[in-house]
């Protein structure tokens, strides 16, 4: 069987993520057979949980029941987990000190983004450097630290409505933005973002949150963010904290990490 790519969060998981009555309410790693990481977790074939980086997380009874139930949409979903048995968030300084965990980790990250800090956030396939897209000082600082003063940056918006605040979007562009790969789409800018983002080209790259963690972050921040890959020039994206700290420790202020390996 072909190895599937990583898919952005599906509508059903998104509903559960925001439902206070659901046991996966605010679970930053919610997924099912229709969405979530695949390619980024596989260590070897066949594609079974034991051969993925989720193998170290033992499923709780409830997750196990879902995994074994052919009528459940989490039937044989290899990355399935919940708050009780799944990966955890940690907010760290670049010397490796853990400042906060889980809900508090996300809260501290958001507070620091509001304060103009640059945060490395571990996504499905690697770390991204993130700052508040409406804070022109933070944007300039990120470009300076990354030594890419003239390279345009993409912004992540919490939803289509927010994206429409900053770009002109037609029906086909909206469809692509909302697709299950959540690609960056180059759009005609409304020119109300800090000029350094698009380097004056008249267009802006926008994408919507691909993961539950990004949805939770943007819902609370209520501002678009810059999200650019955390990689030294002409090298692949960094995927673990130790690499990040040693290679890009001077570029970001803090890191929002998790213990699900890539």
What are these regions (language model features)?
Residues 2-262:
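Active-site-adjacent structural elements in enzyme catalytic cores
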